Design a protein with these regions (language model features):
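Long, well-ordered early-domain segments
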Residues: 1-7
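Short low-complexity, flexible loop/linker segments enriched in glycine and/or proline
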Residues: 15-25
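A short loop-to-beta-strand scaffold at the N-terminal edge of the catalytic core in hydrolase folds
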Residues: 44-45
Length: 194
């Protein structure tokens, strides 16, 4: 199943099945800022879990809409952030308006991180965390000029964090990876050999 943004940008209506599974998007919330989705990712994941067969492994896709353009302007001020903490990338003008936009972007990233933490806390509460493979990544770089939709680093550099309880040793790496490897890796981890 999934919540938020499922499989995209293809058109799965023709096939009649979304590769991400059944949608769990019924639970809504009042977002803290206008650029943030009203989808309650955490409660929708809980609905999926309640609906699932507890004797079977599960796969769930949380397709966060954040951070995407449409950030609420000056949301950073409501979060008591300061322009002085911003380091503007060299491909953008070093201007207070740009710094504010970067901080508005960070507000959405922090919101997404908080939602993910709540899902992790739920997995821990249910005793599922140590046996759940969690992959966090994105489909493109930051939504700024000279970044997203380009082949420069800022357009293709995406986060990647993977945890699986004590089954994967914690480490940081700067090695190049390919998202093409995700599906075979997940199938292998699930013991599916085809």
């Amino acid at each position: 199943g999934y919540t938020g943004k499922g499989w995209a940008p293809g058109d799965c209506k023709e096939r009649g099945v979304n590769p991400a599974g059944k949608a769990f998007n019924k639970k809504k919330l009042t977002p803290p800022y206008s650029g943030i989705s009203n989808i309650d990712y955490v409660e929708n994941f809980k609905l999926f879990y309640q609906d699932s067969d507890k004797k079977q492994p599960f796969c769930f896709w949380v397709g966060f809409n954040e951070p995407h353009r449409g950030f609420e302007r000056d949301s950073w001020q409501k979060e008591n952030k300061s322009l002085s903490i911003v380091s503007v990338p060299g491909f953008l003008p070093n201007h207070d308006v740009v710094k504010g936009d970067l901080l508005d972007y960070s507000v959405e990233i922090e919101y997404q991180d908080a939602q993910l933490q709540k899902i992790i806390d739920f997995l821990k509460e249910k005793g599922l965390f140590d046996n759940t493979l969690i992959i966090v990544t994105a489909d493109n770089g930051m939504a700024f000029p000279n970044a997203k939709a380009t082949c420069y680093d800022a357009g293709v550099h995406v986060p990647l964090a993977i945890c699986w309880g004590d089954k994967i040793k914690r480490k940081n790496t700067s090695e190049i990876v390919s998202s093409v490897d995700f599906a075979p890796t997940m199938l292998d981890a699930a013991g599916i050999n085809r």
